[in-house]
Regions:
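N-proximal helix/coil linker or "cap" segments that precede and/or mark the start of modular domains
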Residues: 1-3
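A short beta-strand-turn-helix
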Residues: 5-23, 64
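Short pre-active-site segment immediately N-terminal to redox-active cysteine/selenocysteine motifs
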Residues: 21, 28-31, 74
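Hydrophobic beta-strand anchors of alpha/beta hydrolase catalytic cores
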Residues: 24-25, 55, 78
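Typically the conserved alpha-helix immediately C-terminal to a functionally engaged Cys/Sec
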Residues: 36-49
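Structured functional modules or segments
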Residues: 50, 57-61
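Structural microenvironment flanking redox-active thiols in thiol-disulfide oxidoreductases
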Residues: 60-68
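Non-catalytic, surface beta->alpha helical segment in thiol-disulfide oxidoreductase systems
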Residues: 74, 82-107
Length: 107
C-alpha cells in the first residue's frame, strides 16, 4: 500500500480499489471552499494511516464518471471502501474525529 496521498482518475480508480484492502476517497473540486478546508485533514490522514490504508483524492470535475458511479451529489464527500465495497460515507466538512472514527471501525 502507498504511504502518500494519491490522486485518482476515472482511469485509475478501479485498479486502486481492486489492489488495496481499504481506500479512503475524498471526492472534491478546486472551486469548493469546504473541499479546500478539508484538504489538510485528508493529507494528515494519509500520513498517519500510512501502511494501513490508501488515502486518495478524486476531482469530480475532471472525473465525472466515477463521481456519478458513486452518486456523489455534494462535495466534499469522503467514501471509505473496504474489500471493494463502500462501508462509510461522510458528506460535507466534518470534524477530524469523525474521519478517524470511521477508519478505526474498519481497520
Amino acid at each position: 500500500m502507498g504511504n502518500e496521498l494519491i490522486h485518482l482518475t476515472d482511469a485509475t480508480f478501479q485498479q486502486t480499489i481492486d489492489n488495496n484492502k481499504i481506500v479512503l476517497v475524498d471526492f472534491w473540486a478546486g472551486w469548493c471552499g469546504p473541499c479546500r478546508a478539508l484538504a489538510p485533514t485528508i493529507e494528515e490522514l494519509a500520513k498517519e494511516y500510512s501502511g494501513k490504508i490508501v488515502v486518495a483524492k478524486l476531482d469530480v470535475d475532471e472525473n465525472p464518471e466515477t463521481a456519478e458511479k458513486f452518486q456523489v451529489f455534494s462535495i466534499p464527500t469522503v467514501v471509505l471502501i473496504k474489500d471493494r465495497c463502500e462501508v462509510e460515507r461522510i458528506v460535507g466538512l466534518c470534524p477530524r474525529k469523525q474521519y478517524d472514527g470511521a477508519l478505526q471501525k474498519h481497520l
